[in-house]
Amino acid sequence: MKQYKDLCRHVLENGEKKGDRTGTGTISTFGYQMRFNLQGGFPMLTTKKLHFKSIAHELLWFLKGDTNVRYLQENGVRIWNEWADENGELGPVYGSQWRSWRGADGETIDQISRLIHDIKTNPNSRRLIVSAWNVGEIDRMALPPCHCLFQFYVADGKLSCQLYQRSADVFLGVPFNIASYALLTMMIAHVTGLEPGEFVHTFGDVHIYQNHVEQVNLQLTRDVRPLPKLRFARNVDSIFDFAFEDFIIEDYDPHPHIKGAVSV
């Protein structure tokens, strides 16, 4: 995708070398935005092969409200293993915040159910927002949310989503995040009777780890290929009824996978 290659160039050309929590070191910039028209194909990176199974199962795991890696491991997904404790627990991370945000009065709020209800009943609302940044529970999370707030917008029968990502690993994380939130937008559009619109990806600290520079430069030498298509295998009424088998990716022809170390 041209948008992704432009992001890589922007960080390499304008970034500052900075230390970071992991000790790896980054090239970092602050503030950037990409836009993807979801009518023009499913925005899954073609300059390296992505593991769609991991993307889809992680999203389904979030939507279940789950915070234990057992479900992921049972489905061959290992991307959260480094942060889990000996029992597989991660604390009140994304799934907990999306489905059971703990309010000051002790009440839990299902933000996803409320969001879908509001899209159906009040599509012009400017409050179609889900937040994972629960200040009162940050210290109990194995990893504070990187993609921490997203908002939906309905116009002309189309549903668009904007994500704010406070911290973005350009090589490993961002390609997953693009595909994940594009998929989420398409799923919510499906169950609310809308068409997918745009996915807008807004960044805070967007960075390339020092040990990923070679891999990023390799991607910049590769031609962008046509985007794949994503369709659903059946009609689904509830966002919580989707299963991995419902997602069909067609015409995905990426360049070969590129390995990179995860900074924990």
From Swiss-Prot:
One MF annotation (Gene Ontology) recorded for this entry: thymidylate synthase activity
Pathway the protein acts in: Pyrimidine metabolism; dTTP biosynthesis
Record flagged with keyword rRNA processing: no
Source domain of life: Bacteria
InterPro entries: Thymidate_synth/dCMP_Mease, Thymidate_synth/dCMP_Mease_dom, Thymidate_synth/dCMP_Mease_sf, Thymidylate_synthase, Thymidylate_synthase_AS
Cellular compartments annotated: Cytoplasm
Pfam families: Thymidylat_synt (PF00303)
Enzyme class of the recorded protein, top EC level: transferase
GO CC annotations on file: cytosol
EC numbers: 2.1.1.45
Stored SUPFAM superfamilies: Thymidylate synthase/dCMP hydroxymethylase
Positions of (6R)-5,10-methylene-5,6,7,8-tetrahydrofolate binding: H51, D169, S263
Alphabetic keyword roster: Cytoplasm, Methyltransferase, Nucleotide biosynthesis, Transferase
Gene3D superfamilies the UniProt entry points to: Thymidylate synthase/dCMP hydroxymethylase domain
NCBIfam families attached to this UniProt entry: PRK01827.1-3, PRK01827.1-5, thym_sym
Name listed for the protein in its UniProt record: Thymidylate synthase 2
Native species: Bacillus amyloliquefaciens (Bacillus velezensis)
Gene: thyA2
